Amino acid sequence: MSKVKIKNVNEKTIKEKFWVWCAIISMTVYVVWRIFFTVPDHNIYGWVATICGIFLVAAETISMLEGTEHFTRLRRKSIPEKPVLPLDWFPDVDVFIATHNESADLLYKTVNGCKHMRYPDRKKVHIYLCDDSNRPEVAALARKMGVGYFGMEENKLAKAGNLNHALSLTHSPYVATFDADMIPTREFLMETVPYMFLPRLKQLDDGTWAERSEDEVDEDFKMGFIQTPQSFYNPDLFQFNFYSEKRIPNEQDFFFREINVGRNRANAPIYAGSNTLISREALDEVGGIATGTITEDFETGIKIQAKGYTCYALDKALAHGLAPTDIDSLI
């Protein structure tokens, strides 16, 4: 990662830094007060109360340390410069749209968005509807729109099994994954694919890009995935119920545009399962999408990073979906 030029975006202003330091100082004063003045005296209240008090203070101290680390990480967001890629370098990409019980009308919007993604050679973009419910209407939609269809009779591994089934039937070096409702913008591939070539390219002093020589190539520098924000075109439950669509941001914005991007410096951005471009080599090395867990995306991302792959999160929304509109969908 040291060979990549990093641009720091959204540097905190003096006012913002002032409030951050106020928060850190106040938390420190609070924890010191809790440790020295509020832990129950065992001579008065007994050992059970004292031990419980110590555990509570320890939990609050850990929370404070985590908060301090969080403020430090978000002091500036770090995103690598996007390489300028020769047009003939753009590789084949498989686009997976995972669906379970979503309607054909909803899937139409996503497929339509995928078909309109800009790319130098459109023949290199292979779009597939991955349907683990094997529904005739979804297969008909795929035929109508001229995209591939992978149906499954019995999928006992949920979304992970669905995507792994698609991986076993395709071969492009890169895979873009989308949830059924996530509609990519025209620029999704043009904004994400170039980052996969950071190990092969270098930025010169004049801002142009050139291919690294054999001596300059670091064999250990491999790209794993590029995660873009999950953005929504309708208000979430909180915005809607508090009549605050124009006054408060979607709850996902803070995580995807601040926290996840802030994790770039530690090579720890989280794979969110959608709106992502992933290296097939990385997926093959970790055995595909993780199974046996309800957080297959999170675990898959960690496994890829543990294998030494470099991963980045971007703060630019390149796909937009449908926020949950009821409690059942949210859960």
Model-derived features with residue positions:
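Cell-envelope/extracellular polymer assembly enzymes that use nucleotide-activated donors
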Residues: 91-94, 126, 284, 299
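The conserved acidic donor/metal-binding loop of glycosyltransferases
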Residues: 178-183
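Active-site beta-to-alpha loop of glycosyltransferases that engages the nucleotide-sugar donor
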Residues: 90, 97-112, 133
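Long helical/loop segments within the catalytic core of UDP-sugar-dependent glycosyltransferases
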Residues: 151-168, 172, 186-294, 299, ...
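A conserved acidic beta->alpha catalytic loop
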Residues: 120, 130-138, 154-155
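Short, acidic, metal-binding catalytic loop of nucleotide-sugar glycosyltransferases
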Residues: 110-124, 199
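N-terminal membrane-anchoring/stem segments of glycan-assembly enzymes
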Residues: 1-89, 142
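Short aromatic/hydrophobic "clamp" motif used to bind/position activated sugar donors
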Residues: 175
